[in-house]
Amino acid sequence: MIEAARSFPQYQFVVAGAPGIEPDFYKQYIDSSTKIVFGQTYRLLQQAEAALVTSGTATLETALFRVPQVVCYYTAAGKLVSFLRRHILKVKYISLVNLIADREVVTELVADGMTVANIKKELAKIVPGGSGRPLMHSEYDRLIAILGEPGASERAASQITALLKSNHKA
């Protein structure tokens, strides 16, 4: 990540530290120009121009903040994982954004695909002025429409309650 960050000197790189991970853990991966913040992920996303995100709910949260992102997931067994993904595993995507959209909305750099060169190339596409930024914003709008308006759990609970009441009367 440090090498990739050096290619974008006009931006401040900030790491949103994960709960339960000590700050010292991150120091081996970053240099003094990169900040680490804890407990302020949403505030950070409100300010972000683009993001490198590990897979999980963070990818969906980043999309809901409409921050263009590249999903990065490294594993020491990169070649094996890449082989398994291509030939055995049935899941096309690892990020919630792509799984929900059922197509590639965000680039996933996984296992041996996560290289400094690939990070730089994909990040350049989504920073302001990048060629992929407008399309990603458009795809985020589509994703948000798929997810529906806020209050989905309340609407689901109301529908379940109504269904139970109607079945109880029958």
Spans of features found by a protein language model:
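Nucleotide-activated sugar donor-binding and catalytic core shared by glycosyltransferases
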Residues: 1-170
